[in-house]
Amino acid sequence: MRIAVGLGKEGGEERLERQGISRRDFMKFCTAVAVAMGMGPAFATDVAAALTGRRPSVVYLHAAECTGCSEALLRTYQPFIDTLILDTISLDYHETIMAAAGEAAEEALQAAVNGPDGFICLVEGAIPTGMDNKYGYIAGHTMYDICKNILPKAKAVVSIGTCACYGGIQAAKPNPTAAKGINDCYADLGVKAINVPGCPPNPLNMVGTLVAFLKGQKIELDEVGRPVMFFGQSVHDLCERRKHFDAGEFAPSFNSEEARKGWCLYDVGCKGPETYNNCPKVLFNETNWPVAAGHPCIGCSEPNFWDDMTPFYQN
């Protein structure tokens, strides 16, 4: 995988042509992003303009997490992440996929953070604050200090995944590392991260948030810091099984005849009525989403869901 570094001088059309990406495929992707943003397919050209402009420097930091959010982002489609997104943005630091290691990686991070044109910072993972922040180290520095030194310098900060947004499973009771989300840790430093939660979040929500920033669009947030364009409706209201809920038709168990008929999964634990996300609308990999596949929503985009939504298979 080739990762572009630095602000590119070539135009967007040239980059697409060099990567062998047809305009048709590119516009199909832009249409999907526009729809996910609630703008409608007519705004695909605006998304395309944002993605083919001058490449912004992006720094992607990891804290206490499982890397599932990165795995989800790497599986964005039409075109795939390695042929479009990493060449549209200049991903200057990402520990999981960058070729550099050790001192070379640290030098790349400092070069991006101190560059003349600024950078956007994405953060995946919760911040361990227990035992004087010593539960998590990278390159001899605590995760807390790394983010403390970098986030206030960023043009924008986006928390990727529920761990970075609200603490996630790291913050589940009894929370032995005193893990916290980004805004809980650094609000006193003036950091106000945009939260894109999920375990993992849909890649279109991640990309759409970046597109909105690149377009200079004002991003309306809900009371827990999520973009309303992606998290403004409940899973319940968007769900294709909603009509069965309204009709009082509930599957009594998994793999029951009623479940196979598409009846509502509320009685087997679905948390869709309490969860705000666009999973039924955008799907994952254009293929499916958990409830359509027969599994109840577990509320993974909500704060404290590991504690508040369990047991997952009861309501």
From Swiss-Prot:
Its EC number is 1.12.2.1. Its main location: periplasm. One of its GO terms (cellular component) is periplasmic space. Predicted to be exported by the Tat system. The position of the signal peptide cleavage has been experimentally proven. Binds 2 [4Fe-4S] clusters. Transmembrane segments: none annotated. [4Fe-4S] cluster 1 binds at C66, C69, C163, C199. GO terms for molecular function: 3 iron, 4 sulfur cluster binding; 4 iron, 4 sulfur cluster binding; cytochrome-c3 hydrogenase activity; electron transfer activity; ferredoxin hydrogenase activity; metal ion binding. Keywords: 3Fe-4S, 4Fe-4S, Iron, Iron-sulfur, Metal-binding, Oxidoreductase, Periplasm, Signal. Residues 1-49 form the signal peptide. InterPro entries: Cytochrome-c3_hydrogenase_C (IPR027394), NADH_UbQ_OxRdtase-like_20kDa (IPR006137), NiFe-Hase_small_C_sf (IPR037148), NiFe_Hase_small_N_sf (IPR037024), NiFe_hydrogenase_ssu (IPR001821), TAT_signal (IPR006311), TAT_signal_bac_arc (IPR019546). GO terms for biological process: anaerobic respiration. It catalyses: 2 Fe(III)-[cytochrome c3] + H2 = 2 Fe(II)-[cytochrome c3] + 2 H(+). It is found in: Periplasm. It holds the Pfam family Oxidored_q6. Coiled coil: none annotated. Belongs to the [NiFe]/[NiFeSe] hydrogenase small subunit family. Heterodimer of a large and a small subunit. This is Periplasmic [NiFe] hydrogenase small subunit. The gene is hydA.
